């Protein structure tokens, strides 16, 4: 509609059904990964893309230390459901976007350096860490990231609720296509 094309494609994240998106408009394009492990379908969707916004989790060692969890649990989270900085760098390199952005990433002054260092082992192109209110300007000439300036923050007011979600069930086995779509190196 109005010259905008949005295309979804499957990605790999815990349960079958996760998707990423590609948005094309006026000769410009953006790919958003959603939560995913490194995935062939995502790289294929990046053909000629201007901006790739890809989820990235901190290294397992950093997650373990900062979240106070055992290293083996952090490794399972980062490598089993998300994308490490090094693997994000590999995806950025294969995708060939004009600019890449890491999102879904909590960093502080102690961890931003290690995240970039690990990502840089696989990719040396333009990359930013996006956060809430990051704005991207994508034009024929350039792709720029900046932070929006907003008025005073207001916490949302949450009303009373007695809604309960469905009970959690055991995860289903992964679909067969994951084995050929997963990028491991």
Predicted regions and their residues:
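Cap/insert and terminal regions of metallo-dependent hydrolase folds
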Residues: 20, 26-29, 37-134
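Core dinuclear metal-dependent hydrolase active-site scaffold
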Residues: 1-45, 132-172, 177-185
């Amino acid at each position: 509609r109005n010259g905008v094309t949005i295309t979804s494609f499957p990605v790999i994240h815990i349960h079958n059904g996760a998707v990423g998106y590609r948005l094309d408009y006026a000769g410009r394009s953006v790919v958003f990964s959603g939560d995913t492990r490194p995935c062939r379908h995502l790289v294929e969707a990046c053909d000629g893309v201007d901006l790739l916004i890809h989820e990235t989790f901190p290294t397992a060692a950093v997650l373990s230390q900062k979240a106070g969890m055992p290293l083996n649990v952090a490794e399972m989270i980062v490598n089993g459901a998300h994308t490490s900085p090094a693997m994000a760098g590999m995806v950025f390199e294969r995708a060939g976007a004009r600019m890449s952005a890491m999102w879904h990433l909590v960093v502080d002054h102690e961890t931003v350096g290690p995240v970039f260092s690990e990502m840089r082992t696989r990719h040396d192109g333009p990359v930013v860490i996006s956060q809430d209110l990051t704005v991207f300007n994508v034009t024929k000439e350039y792709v720029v990231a900046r932070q929006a300036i907003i008025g005073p923050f207001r916490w949302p007011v949450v009303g009373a609720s007695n809604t309960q979600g469905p009970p959690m069930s055991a995860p289903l086995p992964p679909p067969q296509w994951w084995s050929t779509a997963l990028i491991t190196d």
